[in-house]
């Protein structure tokens, strides 16, 4: 068992863990302001999808197609592909989403991560406060990780976080996740500044800090910055 725990810990350090554990919102939150990492919208959007290019060389596309609903509720099918800075597949996701005009939502998705395996994620978001200037939401997710490593069993990750946005211009987020199997905790803090926006394009500056700890590895807070350009369609 110790060897298995150590192996999974090493794997999660080596594999791009933004796809495995905390959805540090990263890519999805920038496009559908989401969770884990998880496309739970703050308001029901009309766009069917988006393409995003990041300054670190990563990129991705997400498509969200309404299935049924009305002006207050919407059920959609969604899919996405993330590419690494070497134009290789980082993650591919498909699933279902529910959005409410008041900012509440939920998703059920399956993601394939090359070099790791698959994961199933259920995520939800509740809008706690919204007016013309402020938007504040809480979110949570539960993920079943299914690694394709011999003799390593499936394991679960749970997490939660909060998102804040001021005038659709300045945003902040805080997230935490826990994985029992390897006793790993992940933490992330993030900020976002919108530099330019039209109904179909957005240019943003992103900054963040993240850390993790396990019985075998502990990291310090690691800073990151990036620019991202998104085209909605």
UniProtKB/Swiss-Prot annotation:
Residues 1-17 form the signal peptide. The keyword Secreted applies. GO terms for cellular component: extracellular region. One of its GO terms (biological process) is defense response to bacterium. Its main location: secreted. It is found in: Secreted. Keywords: Antibiotic, Antimicrobial, Cleavage on pair of basic residues, Immunity, Innate immunity, Repeat, Secreted, Signal. Residues 18-46 form a propeptide. There are six forms of attacin that are divided into two groups: acidic (E and F) and basic (A, B, C, and D). Belongs to the attacin/sarcotoxin-2 family. Hemolymph antibacterial protein. This is Attacin-B.
């Amino acid at each position: 068992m110790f060897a298995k725990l150590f192996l999974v810990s090493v794997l999660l350090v080596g594999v791009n863990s933004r796809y495995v554990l905390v959805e540090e919102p990263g890519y999805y939150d920038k496009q559908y302001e989401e969770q884990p990492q998880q496309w739970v919208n703050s308001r029901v959007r009309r766009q069917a999808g988006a393409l995003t290019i990041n300054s670190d060389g990563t990129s991705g596309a997400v498509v969200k197609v309404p299935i049924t609903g009305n002006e207050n509720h919407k059920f959609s099918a969604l899919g996405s592909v993330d590419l690494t800075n070497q134009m290789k597949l980082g993650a591919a996701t498909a699933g279902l989403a529910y959005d409410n005009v008041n900012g509440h939502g939920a998703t059920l998705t399956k993601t394939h991560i090359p070099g790791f395996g698959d994961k199933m994620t259920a995520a939800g978001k509740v809008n706690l406060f919204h007016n013309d200037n402020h938007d504040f939401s809480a979110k949570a997710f539960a993920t079943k990780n299914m690694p394709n490593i011999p003799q390593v069993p499936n394991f679960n990750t749970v997490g939660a976080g909060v998102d804040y946005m001021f005038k659709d211009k300045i945003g902040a987020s805080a997230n935490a996740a826990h994985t029992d199997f390897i006793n790993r905790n992940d933490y992330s803090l993030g900020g976002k500044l919108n530099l330019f926006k039209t109904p179909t394009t957005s240019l943003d500056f992103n900054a963040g800090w993240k850390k993790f700890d396990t019985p075998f590895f502990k990291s310090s807070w690691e800073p990151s910055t990036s620019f991202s350009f998104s085209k909605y369609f």
